[in-house]
Amino acid sequence: MSETSCSFFIEKEFQDGQLENVSAGLSSSYKDKGALMAFRGIPISELTNHGILQALTAETNGWQPGVVSEEVLRAQEEWEVVDTIHPDIESGVHCQQPGQLISFNEALEHFQSVDLSSFKKRIQPTIQRTGLAALRHCLFGPPKLHQGLREERDLVLTIAQCGLDSQNPTHGRVLQTIYKKLTGSKFDCALHGDHWEDLGFQGANPATDLRGAGFLALLHLLYLVMDSKTFLMAQEIFRLSHHHIQQFPFCLMSVNITRIAIQALREECLSRECNRRQKVIPVVNSFYAATFLHLARVWRTQQKTILDSGFVLKDLEALAKKSPKRLLKTLDDYLAQVSKGQTSLLEAHKRPGSQGPHSRDLTFTGVCDLQSHSFESAGLI
């Protein structure tokens, strides 16, 4: 920027940050383009630190409000909004970079780098069978997991033994990321509060809803919202969970699906696919997403409500353990179609001959047996 086009100087700065004199001058070629043209190369933070924004929008040194451009006013308004946002100091989380989202891989690396030996002692990697059950499993059951993959399997089961620690910065970032991605919020929120009920937790503290799944339940939610291939699916299921009739607790349902994934892994239902891919964690993640997708389709197409949840989850677990390959194939097909913009979860898989959204040709038996509206009696916990 040349001296002929713009010049400004600051003669003296008081200790309180106010300026004794700010002088700005523009050449005639810039007067018609608005005041901000002269300062376009200066960050807004510098403008406010030196009082230049105030000088541009006040009657100082001959500057009249009438000559202030809309761009200057808009910049000032944006800065004032930013200046009024205060970090969450009550949540107990002190991140080095507040507000930064965390990826699934970064969260996983955290657990790979810390000592989990006390949690690992609690795991039971496989189901112990005896008698005829053991013989039947040996003859007709799935293959055993390859030796080289067992450490990765044990890590998954160990994470499921870990609880949520609100004082741990990584744990806090995982929660914040899930909240921001599902709600679209750009700002941090308290780790305890009623706003977590909006996401489908039972109460103000998400930690109380992780029984039987531990932190793995949160890692699965993180995977769902941070993977570009499954994020749209997560949004659609979350939207379905807020349906005025078919609403259900999104996060609580997700925790139950993580439990199903844990059981499928321990019962070696996923061993064949893990051996084929030579990986465990990606298979478990995909199995979780595929099971959630199937639940959402059943919920949508069969007009399920919270009263049906116990039966839906029971049938879902049986199907998932019996036909994991089928579920994974369905997920792959769905994601391929979504990437081409050819399908929507909320409109997918209507059976031929269906009489519309209220068709009852597909039902679970005993659906009306549940009388209570509570999550516990519905079989969600």
Curated annotation (Swiss-Prot):
<keyword id="KW-0966">Cell projection</keyword>
<dbReference type="GO" id="GO:0015031">
    <property type="term" value="P:protein transport"/>
</dbReference>
<dbReference type="GO" id="GO:0120045">
    <property type="term" value="P:stereocilium maintenance"/>
</dbReference>
<comment type="function">
    <text>Acts as a GTPase-activating protein (GAP) for ARL2 with low specific activity.</text>
</comment>
<feature type="domain" description="ELMO">
    <location>
        <begin position="170"/>
        <end position="324"/>
    </location>
</feature>
<dbReference type="GO" id="GO:0005929">
    <property type="term" value="C:cilium"/>
</dbReference>
<keyword id="KW-0206">Cytoskeleton</keyword>
<dbReference type="InterPro" id="IPR006816">
    <property type="entry name" value="ELMO_dom"/>
</dbReference>
<dbReference type="GO" id="GO:0060117">
    <property type="term" value="P:auditory receptor cell development"/>
</dbReference>
<keyword id="KW-0969">Cilium</keyword>
<dbReference type="GO" id="GO:0008104">
    <property type="term" value="P:protein localization"/>
</dbReference>
<dbReference type="GO" id="GO:0007605">
    <property type="term" value="P:sensory perception of sound"/>
</dbReference>
<dbReference type="InterPro" id="IPR050868">
    <property type="entry name" value="ELMO_domain-containing"/>
</dbReference>
<dbReference type="GO" id="GO:0005856">
    <property type="term" value="C:cytoskeleton"/>
</dbReference>
<dbReference type="GO" id="GO:0010467">
    <property type="term" value="P:gene expression"/>
</dbReference>
<dbReference type="Pfam" id="PF04727">
    <property type="entry name" value="ELMO_CED12"/>
</dbReference>
<keyword id="KW-0343">GTPase activation</keyword>
<keyword id="KW-0963">Cytoplasm</keyword>
<dbReference type="GO" id="GO:0060271">
    <property type="term" value="P:cilium assembly"/>
</dbReference>
<dbReference type="GO" id="GO:0060091">
    <property type="term" value="C:kinocilium"/>
</dbReference>
<dbReference type="GO" id="GO:0007010">
    <property type="term" value="P:cytoskeleton organization"/>
</dbReference>
<protein>
    <recommendedName>
        <fullName>ELMO domain-containing protein 3</fullName>
    </recommendedName>
</protein>
<dbReference type="GO" id="GO:0005794">
    <property type="term" value="C:Golgi apparatus"/>
</dbReference>
<dbReference type="GO" id="GO:0032420">
    <property type="term" value="C:stereocilium"/>
</dbReference>
